[in-house]
Amino acid sequence: MPKFNYKGFRYVEVSCSEPTELKKECLTGYFMHNDVPEVGNVTTSDPIINKIWKATNVSYLSNLFGYPTDCPQREKNGWTGDGHLGIEAGLYNYDALTIYEKWLADHRDEQQPNGVLPDIIPTSGWGYGTENGLDWTSTIALIPWNVYLFYGDSK
């Protein structure tokens, strides 16, 4: 993880206490995400399809920081519904097995004795009683199922 914090952004505003000439070359931005090897590629004769594929992968990577997150610019939480919706696109393109193994360990850590899971994993305690439904906490079944389909890993 970054030493302090990270944010997704499109524009940067710089404020100074006195007039300063600042060129864009003076600023550095980093595209940060978990280091997952690329395993898939799509190239078509349609440049629009190629751009959509690239944008999908950039979106997936920008939301991969220790676990799948919901967005790179605000909450950056492991919303379970968002996580299981993106797993197929992710695994077709990246070897992210260790990311999902770790996230499943987080699931086991957060699961209450009665089986209840929170909507955000990992959580600081929020999301256990929100009743978002099975579509959110179904990650406990959908993530292992997709890991099995892509890797043949039945553990």
Task: List the predicted regions and their residue ranges.
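Generic recognition of stable, solvent-exposed alpha-helical segments in well-folded globular domains
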Residues: 7, 22, 47-55, 78-85, ...
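Carboxylate/His-rich catalytic cores and anion/metal-binding grooves
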Residues: 39, 83-109
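Amphipathic, well-packed alpha-helical segments that form the structural scaffold of globular domains
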Residues: 57, 61-65, 84, 105-108, ...
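Helix-terminus loop motifs that line ligand-binding clefts
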Residues: 97-155
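Conserved hydrophobic/aromatic pocket- or pore-lining residues that grip, position, or stack substrates
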Residues: 12, 56, 86, 107, ...
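Extended acidic/polar, glycine-enriched regions
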Residues: 1-51
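Solvent-exposed loop and edge beta-strand segments that line ligand/cofactor-binding
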Residues: 2, 68-80, 124-137
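Active-site-adjacent substrate/metal-binding segments within catalytic domains
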Residues: 48-51, 55-70, 115-116, 125
